[in-house]
A protein has these predicted regions:
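Catalytic core of carbohydrate-active enzymes
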Residues: 1-203
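A short amphipathic beta-strand at an alpha->beta junction
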Residues: 204-213
Length: 213
């Protein structure tokens, strides 16, 4: 009833949600594990930064995502204050820190990913029952250590209580011109996808050599 333009924008937002379902599901798992809120005030990232306490619009989602929603009409550029460290703008892969401005496009909800994060993303699909053939891991450069979690199970039933789940812990480390990505896995569940792509974001130099074990 709002016209094709707005229908398409709503469709894009819904499809983005489905692409980020691995992050959403893992955020729910972390909440059941230790009570971590899935959506948090920015002060959770650094309680000692007084500027973060003043931010009312933006919020943290899951382990490593910061969302800066557009809540006013006709906004073309939006100011954002980021917690300490580098954060990558998802749509461009550009790193930023502190106070900055981003260009606002109607079909791109502004959000950032923390440096060192491993962000699991599904391909575009229309419903949760659709077969998922591959998973993409967006790996964000950081000079230092970081960890990320990906939790998966059948999505229904109680078999996860007897070990039928998959928990992957990703550990990244950038140091002296090298970068390592390690994975530890727990649980007996095997996800349906057979292919995993790795997409490197923000690396300061061209990758000259890659070693897989």
């Amino acid at each position: 009833s709002f016209g094709d333009k707005w229908t398409d924008l709503a469709k894009n937002a819904i499809e983005l949600r489905y692409c980020l379902l691995p992050c959403l599901y893992s955020a729910f798992w972390l909440h059941t594990l230790d009570g971590s809120p899935m959506i948090r005030h920015l002060a959770f990232a650094d309680a000692q930064d007084p500027k973060l306490w003043e931010v009312e619009r933006d919020f943290l989602f899951g382990e490593h995502i910061l969302v800066s929603p557009v809540i006013q009409p006709k906004v073309q550029r939006q100011g954002v204050y980021l917690p300490k460290g580098n954060w990558y703008y998802f749509w461009t892969g550009q790193p930023g820190h502190g106070e900055l401005f981003v260009n606002v496009l109607p079909d791109q909800i502004p959000f950032f990913v923390r440096e060192g994060a491993v962000l699991p993303v599904y391909p575009t699909h229309q419903h949760t029952g659709e077969h998922i053939e591959e998973l993409t891991l967006y790996v964000y450069y950081k000079n230092g250590l970081e960890s990320s979690h990906l939790y998966e199970d059948a999505g229904e039933g109680y078999d996860y209580q007897t070990g039928m789940f998959s928990l992957k812990v990703f550990e990244t480390e950038g140091k002296n011109g090298t970068f390592s990505l390690r994975q530890r896995k727990e649980g007996a569940y095997t996800p349906e996808y057979k292919k995993v792509k790795i997409y490197l974001v923000g690396f300061p130099t061209f990758v000259k050599k890659c070693v897989a074990d």
